[in-house]
């Protein structure tokens, strides 16, 4: 009886850990933003940002090139951190799209209210 219970408990634990692996593939449209600066000030959606010590020109590009997390900001205000192959090599595939509207296709996950998209494909919508 104990072995059966232990087996069921282990199986349930493994299923709980692998649940994010079953994320739904979606295409999400939004603006590519510097996640850290956007969280600090919701007006920081372009390339230049307002910072406590003054405006910072090309702030989002500098942060993206340094490998800081980028996010997709949708028209309804949802923020999806971009990960996966699009964010690899210090955002190499995303840098040219910072502040532009794009469509990203990939697995979407929600963990404790934090949205993430494992971006595999990107399509430019507008600059």
Model-derived regions, located:
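Sec/Tat signal peptide C-region and signal peptidase I cleavage site
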Residues: 13-23
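Mature soluble domains of exported/periplasmic/lumenal proteins and thiol-rich metal-chelating peptides
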Residues: 23-127
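Bacterial N-terminal signal peptides that target proteins for export
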Residues: 1-9
